[in-house]
Structures are given as C-alpha cells and as structure tokens.
C-alpha cells in the first residue's frame, strides 16, 4: 500500500533457505540473491540460491545471483572466494532469469 515505484527483493546476505512464495507477485520487479562477504562471512549454500531461483521462475519474476559471498557451499564442499571474484563467479554460474515485461 506504500507508493513505491520499483519493488525489488534483495536476499543478502543469504544465510538460510527462504520461502518467498507469499511475496512474489506482479508488483515485484526482481529478486536478487547474494552471499556474505568479509573475514567472518557465514556460509551461503548454493542449493538455497537455486531454490529461490525456482520460486522466481514459478512466479515469472526475474532473478539475479549477484554475489557468491566469501564462503559458498556447493556439492557438499565449501569454497572460499576472494572478494574480487565474488560477483564474476556468481555471473559465471549462468542462473540469472530474465523475462520481457
């Protein structure tokens, strides 16, 4: 009910699985997900990222994986990713979902 022109959901740092199904409607322009950076960064699990992507596709909402974070769990292994590579590694995953509106 607020007069907000552009509604985006930023799930960062992503520290656990999220059910966004109650929030994903035509008013949401995009959901963006990223892990936590820094020396004491907590783990972001790639399965959580993929689950949010699945929810976005089901609701036909654009999805962006913008940053891996410093510690990314994928396939049972935790990867330490230096800050300068966190954005490019997220892009290389190739999981962004765009639609024409």
Model-identified regions with their sequence ranges:
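Short, surface-exposed basic-aromatic patches at helix termini and helix-loop junctions that form
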Residues: 1-3, 24-25
């Amino acid at each position: 009910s607020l007069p907000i022109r552009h509604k985006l959901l930023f799930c960062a740092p992503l520290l656990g699985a999220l059910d966004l199904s109650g929030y994903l409607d035509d008013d949401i322009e995009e959901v963006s997900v990223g892990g936590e950076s820094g020396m004491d960064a907590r783990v972001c699990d790639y399965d959580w990222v993929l689950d949010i992507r699945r929810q976005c596709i089901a609701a036909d909402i654009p999805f962006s994986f913008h940053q891996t974070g410093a510690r990314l769990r994928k396939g049972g292994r935790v990867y330490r990713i230096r800050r300068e590579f966190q954005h490019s590694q997220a892009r290389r995953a190739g999981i962004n979902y765009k639609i024409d509106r």
